[in-house]
């Protein structure tokens, strides 16, 4: 049960959730950059600049209040002056700051998901030990309880809802 659901299914879910969340940004890029460039009204360099703006806005919105510390850290590592406005932050500083912020959020979600399952493991292990069943692996008994809990609380619904809330706040 280590790969349930399979990796391909998880990748598909991640892909379509990304499309859902990023659709407004992709639409803005299409309207401001790709469409004018394909019509020949702007050059490739202008199209790049126009496409970069919606992505920068999206990343800044995701960083929120606590994301500024990542920008400050990367600016300090690059020996650059601290930015006064968001436009002062180079894209090569903004991207890793955004990635670190998202990894931090993902780790927090993972820990929150893990806590109920580890509690179930500890309770089952305690019960098995008190019954003198030391040779029976607790995971073998606790797995059905974990699956039942996940289904009863609508785990996939809660997980996707919290992911969207963390992105769309």
Task: Identify the residue ranges that each predicted region occupies.
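Hydrophobic alpha-helical segments and their helix-loop boundaries in membrane
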Residues: 1-169
């Amino acid at each position: 049960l280590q790969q349930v659901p399979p990796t391909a299914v998880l990748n598909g879910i991640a892909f379509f959730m990304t499309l859902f969340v990023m659709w407004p940004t992709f639409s803005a890029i299409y309207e401001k950059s790709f469409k004018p460039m394909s019509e020949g009204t702007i050059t490739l360099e202008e199209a790049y600049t126009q496409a970069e703006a919606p992505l920068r806005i999206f990343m800044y919105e995701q960083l929120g209040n606590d994301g500024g510390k990542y920008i400050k850290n990367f600016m300090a590592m690059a020996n650059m002056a601290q930015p006064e406005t968001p436009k002062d932050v180079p894209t090569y500083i903004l991207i890793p700051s955004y990635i670190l912020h998202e990894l931090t959020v993902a780790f927090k979600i993972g820990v929150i998901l893990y806590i109920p399952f580890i509690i179930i493991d500890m309770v089952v292990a305690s019960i098995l030990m008190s019954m003198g069943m030391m040779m029976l692996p607790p995971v073998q008994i606790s797995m059905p309880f974990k699956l039942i809990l996940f289904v009863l609380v609508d785990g996939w619904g809660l997980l996707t809802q919290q992911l969207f809330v963390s992105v769309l706040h």
